[in-house]
Structure formats: C-alpha cells, structure tokens
Amino acid sequence: MKNLIWRLLAKLLARPAVANWLITRAQRTPYQHIMSADGQDTYMGRWWLFNPHDRGTHIGRYAWFPWSIRIHHILRPDADRDLHDHPWNARTVILRGKYVEQRPASSEWKDSVRSCLVQGADPKWHEWLTRDACEWLRRDTGDTAVLLHGQYHRIDQVSEGGVWTLFITSRWQGDWGFLVKGKKVDWRIYTGEKP
C-alpha cells in the first residue's frame, strides 16, 4: 500500500506544472553542486527544497521531521566504474527526463537465471555465475525508487538535457563508499582524497 501511495505521488509530482514549480522554487536555495574530477563540468546540480539541518552543526532542527528534500539535476552518468552507496536511506522521484540505473542483481533475477541453467550443475558454478551479476533499471518521468544505505548503484545512462529528480533522504546511517570486488571501500580512499 505504501509503495502504491508513493507511485501515485510520483505521478502527481512529475506533472509538468508541479515539476516546474518544484524546480523553480528549489533553485532559490542552492546546495553544493557536484563537479567532475577535473572540476571543469557539473555532474549534478543540487538545490534544497527543505533542509532540516542546522548550517553550523549539521544536526537536525526538527526531531519529528528528519528528512531532507532536494532537487537534483543529473547531467551525465556516473564516471566511476564501481557501484556506490549513500550515507542514508533515500527515495527519488523522477520529475523530468530519464536515466538507467545499474544495481546488483536481485535474488529474484538470480533465481530466474538459475532456473534456466542445467539442472544438477555444481552449486559453486551457479554462485560464480551470479556473484557479481547486475541488472539495469530504467527510471522514467513519474517513476519512484528507494535506495537504502548499504545498497549499491550507479547511474549508467542519462537522457539528453539531464534528468531532474526530487531526492528525499533520511537520517545519516554511515559513510558512503564504493563496492570493489565485493568489499566496501571508503569514498575518500576510492577518490584519492585520503591515502
């Protein structure tokens, strides 16, 4: 039921008049944009719709409403080849445009592949075949998706002109990082900011 409500809300928020209003309103309160590694291009523009955190302490001002709400304009795919997670649980609503997201394959997908293979094959072979398997999910205008802390993904393709999303995050859960050979690598080490 909860997912149905989110799907209906996503369709409403993606209506052109509503999406335009949200984007215009958010652009009055810029947040830190994410630049390319060389600092020449914007990878993602970010603006606040609602920031519950104190600017100085970064502590939530409202215990009863721990979510932050931003507008993101994703201009290009993730340049990193490895999947990454985020420091909080999040929900995204695609307001305008579309993208293709890469995520580790779900158990359902792996079971489907397994059922198509030779019966009685060595279980280690099945495990090897599906260990690093990924699936690609298309996210269109009006779609919504959840990404929990510790779930990995990457943006693989972005529509021309970029994709505009409403991005809702919960309380901080832990540092974010990249999934490298099945292990989480801290983002500072992965990006070379920390040796």
Where are these regions (language model features)?
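Membrane-proximal basic amphipathic "stem/tether" segments
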Residues: 1-26
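A short glycine-rich, His/Asp/Glu-containing loop-to-beta-strand
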Residues: 40-78
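Conserved short histidine dyad/triad with adjacent acidic residue
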Residues: 70-85, 103, 149
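Short, conserved beta-strand element in jelly-roll/cupin
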Residues: 86-101
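Short acidic-glycine-tyrosine-enriched beta hairpin
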Residues: 102-154
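A short hydrophobic beta-strand segment most commonly corresponding to one strand
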Residues: 144-146, 160-177
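Active-site or metal-binding loop neighborhoods of secreted/extracellular toxin and effector enzymes
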Residues: 175-195
